[in-house]
Amino acid sequence: VQTLLLVGVGRMGLPYLAAGRALGARVVAVETAQKAESIAGLVDRLIVTRGASDELWAEGAFAAVAAERPDGVIAFSEPQVLAASMVQEELGVPGPSLRAGVISRNKALQRGRFAAAGIAQPDYLVVDDLAGASEWALERLPVVVKPLSMAGSMGVELVPDAAAFAEVAARRAGEGRLLVERAVEGPEYSWEALVVDGAVWFANVTAKETTGPPNFIEVAHRSAADITDDVRAGVDRFGADVLAATGMRSGLVHLEFRLTDAGPVLMEIAVRTPGDHLMELLGLTYGLDWFELVARVALGRELPAAPSGPIRYAASYLPLATAGTVTAVHGLEAVREHKAVVEAGLSVAVDSVIEPARSSNQRVGQVLLAAGDRAELEAALAEVRRTLVVETR
């Protein structure tokens, strides 16, 4: 019997537990004390970390491997990537590679590596003092300021002019090392690829919808994006070049890019499970359980035949609400009854306090939809937007 080690599970990683069981594997998990109780009865063994930093995730993963050698290892989210990469490398089991894990975890390392590889990406500067980067930034306005290792748009903001740059430099003076980039115009997409021994088994392009500047919070995703075959082929070639530069071996890749008149321009890459229910969207779109596919790769199992194309079209809607105290919630049950809605939920209720939206953490719920064609999906998505309302004061 094989053993699958999950470094981090959370809520959205629970399908990995089911996937391991479906494949007949024992499942061992490393999780924080805060979330351990919710999964304790679902795994064969549980290692509780002493915190949620990269270092303490690694400590937990090292302890798990010392007690029992797994046959496969999966990192759930961003803070677990380095821990999983190190034990995958140590054990010689399938994984992205330690190099890919390190690059994935640091956006400044990505910029340096991809500049050397000739990958199209924004002009950039790594700074310890934003104010000291003023001359460079003012020559390239608008610019984007972002931290090196956060996810979910946290700390990302567009700076449109000189006055705004001075304000941001003062406000973020004690934040430490930051990345400053020339802003790139063009619609946002992501490229999800399952990779085995450096070769792409299958890839999908997802269209993103964001709030735009200054924080670019993602509010909707549409898998099997409506782009031409030529554009898709160009994106696949671009993705393959990025994988080669990253040193990617085996596992899941989530690559974010903007599509410009000159072609794709890289925003960032991550070698872990994408958020915003993209795995569920991929399953709905192509008729395969992507959590099980990732587990198969991790355990060295055979994969089924790759999909020939979408069997339906899927989207996620991740609503925001005006900052304040929630006074009423309308339409949730009606949304759940819609024939195109697969799942719908809200994370707020009456009297909840909603902070001003600066990152994905301030979104108030999720709706997953699937339909037989794009027009039906868009009509359903529009109806959900009209129906689901969170009122605040």
Label each region the model flagged.
Residues 1-4:
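Extreme N-terminal starter segment of soluble prokaryotic enzymes
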Residues 6-15:
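Glycine-rich adenosine-cofactor-binding loop
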Residues 13, 116, 133, 295-393:
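Peripheral (often C-terminal) accessory segments that flank ATP-dependent C-N-forming ligase machineries
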Residues 30-37:
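Short, polar loop motifs at secondary-structure junctions
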Residues 41-126, 363, 376:
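Conserved N-proximal alpha/beta basic substrate-recognition cap immediately N-terminal to
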Residues 64-70, 137-140, 173-175, 246:
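Glycine-rich phosphate-binding loop signature in dinucleotide/nucleotide-binding domains
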Residues 105-185, 196-199, 221, 225-237, ...:
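Active-site nucleotide/adenylate-binding loops and adjacent lid/helix of ATP-dependent enzymes
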Residues 182-248, 252, 259, 266, ...:
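ATP-dependent carboxylate/phosphate-activation module, predominantly the ATP-grasp catalytic core
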